């Protein structure tokens, strides 16, 4: 009995310390009306290579993430980006100078994953100097019939994850075009180092990254 009490006391202490040490950035409520209209956004859409170095404002970052894959129907938890079978398999990691964060659409905040700036692992030999890089990761385990370690059976989920990530990527591109922000979708990145730094599971696939900033 004493061992059981000690175990739960220790577990609660560890959980408490972990919660105290966690860093969370609360995002703003998204802006309902802003930017150019849809057809103007399509007209302005382009891949940007030259950026200013100043940070994104909290409102711009909040609106960007909501547009990318935020919850637009709170009554059922559905998102701005559709996903196969409503799996909601795509997660967004936000890498900045002060660390890399996980975007939690449910609580509308950023949760620190690592204090390491992982942007160089996505910039490679062609750094753009953007204040933010968004990493799109599909978690195949959210599909109902996902089978761990069974590559052949999971092939369809792998393909659907790629499509779902592409939809989120398009949301990012169109939001940026509509709001005078710059971005470009990229597939190149140091996947081995990123997987280790973010402690990703086997079921999680990194598909694309988006540098985002104010174009010069």
Regions found by a protein language model. Name each.
Residues 95-97, 137-139, 213:
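Structured loops at beta-to-helix junctions and adjacent beta-edge loops in soluble globular domains
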């Amino acid at each position: 009995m004493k061992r059981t009490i000690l175990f739960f006391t220790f577990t609660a202490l560890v959980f408490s310390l972990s919660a105290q040490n966690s860093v969370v950035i609360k995002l703003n409520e998204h802006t309902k009306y802003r930017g150019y209209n849809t057809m103007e956004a399509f007209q302005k859409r382009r891949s940007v290579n030259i950026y200013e170095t100043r940070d994104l404002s909290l409102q711009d970052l909040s609106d960007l993430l909501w547009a990318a894959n935020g919850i637009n129907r709170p009554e059922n938890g559905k998102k701005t980006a559709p996903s196969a079978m409503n799996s909601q398999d795509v997660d967004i990691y936000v890498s900045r100078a002060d660390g890399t964060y996980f975007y939690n659409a449910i609580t509308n905040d950023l949760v620190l994953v690592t204090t390491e700036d992982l942007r160089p692992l996505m910039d490679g030999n062609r750094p753009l100097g953007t204040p933010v890089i968004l990493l799109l990761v599909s978690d195949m385990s959210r599909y109902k019939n996902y089978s761990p370690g069974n590559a052949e059976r999971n092939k369809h989920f792998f393909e659907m994850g790629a499509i779902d990530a592409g939809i989120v990527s398009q949301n990012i591109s169109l939001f940026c075009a509509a709001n005078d922000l710059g971005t470009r979708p990229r597939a190149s990145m140091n996947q081995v180092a990123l997987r280790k730094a973010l402690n990703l599971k086997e079921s999680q696939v990194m598909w694309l990254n988006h540098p985002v900033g104010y174009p010069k």
